[in-house]
Amino acid sequence: MALVADFVLQRLREWGIERVYGYPGDGINGLLGAFDRAEGHPEFIQTRHEEMAAFMACAHAKFTGEVGCCTATSGPGAVHLLNGLYDAKLDHQPVVAVVGQQKRLSLGSHYQQEIALEQLFSDVSEYCQMITHPGQARHVIDRAFKTALTTRSVATIIVPDDIQEEDAQPSPPKMHGSVFSSVGWSRPRMLPDEGELRKAADILNAGEKVAMLIGQGAAKAASEVVEAAELLGAGVAKALLGREVLPDDIPFVTGPIGLLGTKASDKMIQNCDTLFMIGTSFPYAEWLPDEGQAKGVEIDIDGRMIGIRYPMDAHLVGDSRETLKALLPLLRRKEDRGWREEIEKDVREWNDLCEKRAGQHFEGKINPEAVASELSPRLPDNCVLTADSGSGTNWWARHLKLRKGMQASLSGTLATMGPGTPYAIAARFAYPDRPVIAFVGDGAFQMNGMNEMITIKRYMDRLAGPAPFIFCVFNNQDLNQVTWEQRAMAGDPKFPGSQYIPDVPYAQYAELLGLKGIYCDQPKKVGKAWDEALASDRPVVLEFKVDQEIAPIPPHIMLAQGKKAAKAAVHDPEKAGIAAKGMRQKLSEVAEHLPGRHHDGE
């Protein structure tokens, strides 16, 4: 007779789960035995750490649209999952975690590795339940999946060690208290009220300078977004999680918005008279219009979040695609295209400026912007791009120009360090024939990326070419994003005790594991290094020794931030090098092209 552990995996299969990311431990011994008997249906993918398993489950959901799944043992293994699960929760991704627990008999005795898991997972999970009876497994699993899909969030199933080894009850006895659930779920067709649609159309039709801001919630509405932009003569800015919704070769797509955004996006938002947000919860008020400057229309599937980021005049709660399809017939084409032409001109000027900056190298060191700039025209069709959190994310956001069919993601809301590498691994497992390229800082690579190269070594037969699989490591021996934040936001000089990190031969480490390692420290060889990496049939660690003193300058510079940065520079340990390179000239060169917003209050 099958055990509860076998039934759990069978039910996961019925819900479409093909692989479960995790790390073994005695709290899930029953499940591990069931994985062995399941013979790869679903398969167990062993990561180096449970946090990486949760990141991979989140990435699977992001890149496939399916539920991601991870597992961990009781106690410490369960605790390790949390950061990756919060990444899924905050970026609205459906993930189911299956977690072990000590035997029911021992619970409440302060037993070894006993943790109150239902309390531990209560905040990160929309649904968290412990299975205490074999007949309960069916409906707990089913409800976990239905909840994860409906809420686009995390559900956690806790399975005590002894329950895993009991005989399964696929169909519990028909008696009072028994529950008989089913596998299945369908996405609802959500549309706003017709009156609100007409109100939204009136606002958009009246606007003379319409700016559109889209996020990942617009992912299935690309053609409708383009049609709306064409009718309204609008430009389209993208929140980072919405990078893949529209390709960057559309002339009126202004690129990312915010601290890592473009001048074109910032200028459009600053000067618009109507803001149209679609499928995004972009939170930063300093990058949105001033209150009262613009009329607002928003589409969001979650009514709890609509009108929260900017005061809206029309609130369209519904699916982005269906709502836009209902709205489009109500929109009138704007004959005056002056606003659109201005936006397209700003996009061209920003792209020219980025190209110019990427070509500036100092003292023979590689400008990190050039790493992204050289890759952009070389990007393979249909590739998947991931980024970690750090200064390299700036160059990933600004210099990589996505084309149709490409996918890209990062930890958008949690903005945690560490997901760039596991995201890429999950993407490769999901799409073994697609090129996958990760941008990772040396800090994040030391934090966990190096360990996950061992995961790649273990599954080399699955993850190797012919499609490129590349981990681009920015080696600047500095936790660079935080260093610049210390300077600009706190007015403090760089503190080497917290910011310096050891120099590690990342490319050589890759070779030690049987991967391909490529090292580049010369500006004129950046393009050649990319060509070599893209031609490899082995996973590649491509290490660039880059200049740590290239500032990730935002699209507009707050006066207060400029003052603090100047104050920090006086006592900065790198002040000699910064001065020698003419950092002031580099900053002023960019600043003269940027919009003002130089208010003391900012």
Briefly describe each language-model feature range.
Residues 98, 106-113, 307-309, 315-317, ...:
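Thiamine diphosphate
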Residues 1-338, 378-381, 435, 460-471, ...:
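N-terminal alpha/beta PP-like core and its mobile active-site loop of ThDP/TPP-dependent enzymes
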